[in-house]
């Protein structure tokens, strides 16, 4: 196996340039090195000005989302050896404003996420002495896969609807709202309806499915969105047929 590989890294330094450029770096190559290891080597040994996000290095925190050879990937879970003989082109996630180099502005996602109330909503609280809220394995399975989301935002980078319409609520936010709607302990489905069923919510999705393909945790946001469309349509039909109490 080759012992070196070239990484072409997108650089954007707003104080000295008006648009991103690419800079090539040659880094050591071992089978164990992820793209994040290559970037860390560049920062530590070749160019300390390179900026990028990372935290856990284990594909859990979701911090290292980037565009690698054109695909939305976690840099910590994507290996340099898979791109031999190179080069490996590393760019920021798409559909987000670039702050510097590989660092993007995620404030739009962070502002939208609370709107779906991604937490357990209870309108009645049983006495503490009644104990915890118990679930059967089947009740857990109903929402478990959607709870695996790590907020890496790769689904937003992959989503053609979000690329065209930044007002779109987006795959992860809708899937997380649906995660709690499907939780037997939650009572907040009606509280989320105005946001999830809005024109910029689930109905804006055109079911391209790139979000589900991009998810590093196997979450199916596209499936969650289509299921919610059915829920929203059923509710709307009930309201039409039974306006005095259609739920």
Curated annotation (Swiss-Prot):
What does the cofactor field's note say?
Answer: Binds 1 [2Fe-2S] cluster.
- Identify the residues that bind [3Fe-4S] cluster: 159, 205, 211
Compartments it resides in: Cell membrane
Q: Name one GO cellular component term.
A: plasma membrane
Source domain of life is Bacteria
Keywords for this protein: 2Fe-2S, 3Fe-4S, 4Fe-4S, Cell membrane, Electron transport, Iron, Iron-sulfur, Membrane, Metal-binding, Oxidoreductase, Transport, Tricarboxylic acid cycle
**Annotated ranges, domain 4Fe-4S ferredoxin-type:** 140-169
Molecular function (GO) terms for this protein are: 2 iron, 2 sulfur cluster binding; 3 iron, 4 sulfur cluster binding; 4 iron, 4 sulfur cluster binding; electron transfer activity; metal ion binding; succinate dehydrogenase (quinone) activity
Q: Which Gene3D superfamilies match?
A: 3.10.20.30, Alpha-helical ferredoxin
Residue numbers binding a menaquinone: 12, 226-229
Record carries keyword 4Fe-4S: yes
Signal sequence interval, chain numbering: none
Q: Which PROSITE patterns match?
A: 4FE4S_FER_1 (PS00198), 4FE4S_FER_2 (PS51379)
Could you say which EC number(s) this protein's record lists?
A: 1.3.5.1
Q: Where does [4Fe-4S] cluster bind?
A: 149, 152, 155, 215
Catalyzed reactions per annotation: a quinone + succinate = fumarate + a quinol; a menaquinone + succinate = a menaquinol + fumarate
Q: What class of enzyme is it?
A: oxidoreductase
What PANTHER family has UniProt attached to this entry? SUCCINATE DEHYDROGENASE [UBIQUINONE] IRON-SULFUR SUBUNIT, MITOCHONDRIAL, SUCCINATE DEHYDROGENASE IRON-SULFUR PROTEIN
- Oligomeric state and partners? Fumarate dehydrogenase forms part of an enzyme complex containing four subunits: a flavoprotein, an iron-sulfur, and two hydrophobic anchor proteins.
- Which NCBIfam families does the record associate with it? dhsB, PRK05950.1
In which family does this protein belong, per the annotation?
Answer: Belongs to the succinate dehydrogenase/fumarate reductase iron-sulfur protein family.
Protein name (database record) = Fumarate reductase iron-sulfur subunit
Q: Could you tell me which species this protein originates from?
A: Mycobacterium tuberculosis (strain ATCC 25618 / H37Rv)
Source organism phylogeny: Bacteria, Bacillati, Actinomycetota, Actinomycetes, Mycobacteriales
Q: Which gene encodes it?
A: frdB
């Amino acid at each position: 196996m080759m012992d070196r590989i070239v990484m072409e890294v997108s650089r954007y330094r707003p104080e000295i340039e008006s648009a991103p450029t690419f800079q090539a770096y040659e880094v050591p190559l071992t089978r164990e090195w992820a793209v994040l290891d290559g970037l860390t080597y560049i920062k530590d040994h070749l160019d300390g000005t390179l900026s990028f996000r990372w935290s856990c290095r284990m594909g859990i925190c979701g911090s290292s989302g980037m565009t690698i050879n054109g695909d939305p990937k976690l840099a910590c879970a994507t290996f340099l050896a898979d791109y031999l003989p190179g080069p490996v082109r590393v760019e920021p996630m798409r559909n987000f404003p670039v702050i510097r180099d590989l660092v993007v502005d995620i404030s739009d996602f962070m502002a939208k996420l609370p709107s779906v109330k991604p937490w357990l909503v209870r309108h009645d609280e049983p006495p503490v002495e009644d104990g915890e809220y118990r679930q059967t394995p089947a009740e857990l399975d109903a929402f478990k896969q959607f709870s695996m989301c790590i907020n890496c935002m790769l689904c937003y980078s992959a989503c053609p609807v979000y690329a065209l319409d930044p007002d779109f609520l987006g795959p992860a936010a809708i899937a997380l709202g649906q995660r709690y709607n499907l939780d037997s302990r939650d009572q907040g489905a009606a509280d989320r309806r105005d946001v999830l069923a809005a024109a910029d919510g689930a109905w804006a999705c055109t079911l391209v499915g790139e979000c589900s393909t991009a998810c590093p945790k196997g979450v199916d946001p596209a499936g969650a969105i289509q299921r919610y469309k059915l829920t929203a349509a059923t509710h709307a039909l009930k309201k039409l047929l039974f306006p005095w109490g259609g739920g």
